[in-house]
Amino acid sequence: MRVLDGEQRLVRIFVGESDRWHHQSLSSALLERLRREGFAGATVFHGTAGFGARSVLHTAHLLRLSEDLPVLIEIVETEDGVARLIPILDEMITEGLVTVETVRVIRYAPGTRPLDGKRS
């Protein structure tokens, strides 16, 4: 059932697979930190090819495990949540790109009352 329909912020964090935070992959460290800080959720996507500010092409070849492949972390949050998030990113990211955009979120969850108050 639809339980949320409204405006939120989509944060996209673009980093490299070889980026580290205290000897741990940056994406894993960010996920752990965001969970610990009480954020609603985050998803990590591993790319198969890409290039960044230096125009160096990074690709996945069959004979190599990786060439510093792109990693995308997506977070959907409130505006206040994004305000809490930015200082964490400032602390943990040394190189990368972060975008924030306004999105319409429609959330469905089982066993909850729908927005119109009627059960189907």
Each language-model region and where it sits:
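Positively charged, small/polar-rich N-terminal and surface patches that mediate targeting and assembly
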Residues: 1-120
